[in-house]
Amino acid sequence: MKKNVIVGQSGGPTAVFNASLAGVYKTAKDMGADTIYGMRYGIQGLLEKKIVDLGEKIRNDMDVELLKRTPASFLGSCRYKLPEISEDKAIYEKIFAILEELEIMAFFYIGDNDSMDTIKKLSDYAETVGNPIRFIGVPKTIDNDLEGTDHTPGYGSAAKYIATVTKELVRDGLIYEMQSVTVIEIMGRNAGWLTGAAVLAKSEDCEGPDLIYLPEVAFDVDDFLKKVKKLVSEKQSIVIAVSEGIKTADGRYVCELSAPSDKTDSFGHVQLSGTGKYLSDLIIEKLGCKSRAIELSTLQRCAGHLTSRVDITEAYQVGGTAVKAAFEGKTGQMVILKRVSQDPYICTTDLYDVHKVANLEKKVPRSWITEEGDYVTAEMKNYIEPLIQAELTPIMITGQPRHIIIDDL
């Protein structure tokens, strides 16, 4: 049997998404894989037989290094949800027919919660029909909401970007004597890991954000305005960090208080946008002071110019661990990161049953949020800080970062 493997990327991109792909590719090559295929646009592309030989696209060690430092998704991504096996067996038969045609022995999928659901379903189907293909999930998400792992690759670099931008916005807000309130809207539907990273801006040379609101705690609009009013009476410039997904006590998204959104993605998730603007407009209307909303949006997930070396290193490692696990005969597993020491920071890789991960969501512990729900504690800051350490700058050509791309992508 040939030792051919295939890898795909799925879900929202990160600044280190491709570092995990590089880890899969290089380790598979070093372990003697015959052909390393890449799925274009994830499982959706596989169904359409959009497949490339990565050996023809990643030609040498310099290409591997470029891949590690290229943000977003080299192979392209998708948000495609596989049906339950009982609902559409034909789609699984089609996937496995394609994999068998390519003589695949191992299948790697780099992604988030929904991607781990794909690994779960494919490994379950393989077991049902007695197919020996091994399925391993490689964690990735800036949201940091995957169960079973200390943190996810992609989060550290996003946290570094958010902390840096917050610090710079605090500095920018102090340039005029005029009173101002800046509301920074940060990604995070149900989990506030990203927004919590704004606390890292609080340092010797920066007072950091004045208020931080996470979706784990119900948001009270009146209480918010009361606190902002008090801050306005005390300070020249106020900076507030809010998760896009904060909700009121009755379960309504704050961004929908002005106009409910009817837009959803392929997984049925409401598309959130406008939380910062709604609150900023409310401050102007109710308090009569200058305010602006800053929506970090996709910038926080594609900032390859400000990555964490720790994050890139770990992203590469989980890719390599996935390959080693498959070559050892493991299947139905997700690679995880285990923090074995806080100071000095030491993290190792391990495996975790994908059935305990798929479709679950890890939230910020309530004890890491202040009692009033308007800031995060030292425990959260200590948890995040090691993940943003050191830098791995892009390879620069004529003053611009050089990226590796697939010509026909």
Predicted regions and their residues:
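Gly-rich Lys/Arg/Thr-decorated short loops/hinges at beta-loop-alpha junctions or inter-strand turns
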Residues: 4-7, 67-81, 140-150, 178-180, ...
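Short glycine-rich or small-residue beta-strand-to-loop segments that form or flank ligand, phosphate
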Residues: 4-14, 73-79, 105-111, 137, ...
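Accessory alpha-helical/coil subdomains and C-terminal extensions
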Residues: 36, 98, 106-111, 117-132, ...
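C-terminal non-catalytic interaction/assembly regions of soluble proteins
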Residues: 256-409
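Short, ordered loop/turn segments at secondary-structure junctions
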Residues: 10-12, 39-45, 79-80, 112-113, ...
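Short glycine/serine/threonine-rich phosphate/pyrophosphate-binding segments
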Residues: 14-24, 46-47, 90-93, 113-121, ...
